[in-house]
Amino acid sequence: MIDNYDDVPDDSKEKVEAIYNEIIRMLDAENNEKILSKKSVLSAKLKNLIALGSALASQQSQNVIFCVKESMKTGATQKEIMEVLRVAILMAEIPAEAYTEIVKDAVKAFEADY
């Protein structure tokens, strides 16, 4: 058993770091879902649309897909989601073509569920 990061063979450290980062990302997503579902003055739909804009601005593809799903789950329409995408493209200067495709694919994937 490896007790310490220094004990990891050099040729495996990149894999270990990738696994660690993925675990942290997953934990953050679960925590974010709990935060977004708490009652507040903002509706769950609005909080999820804001989270989508933030995920787009930070160019985190997996979070974008998750936020599209959560937005749709709380009643966001395709038009509302695309409006968030337009604002993110303008404000954060994200790659429009790539993220438009990601968002459209996510909407298409989840539209039957919501």
Annotate each predicted stretch with a short phrase.
Residues M1-L46, Y99-Y114:
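Acidic, glycine/proline-rich low-complexity segments that act as flexible tails and inter-domain linkers
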Residues S58-L85:
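Mid-chain, well-packed structural core segment of small domains
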Residues S40, A57-S61, G75, E93-A96:
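Residues at alpha-helix boundaries and short interhelical turns
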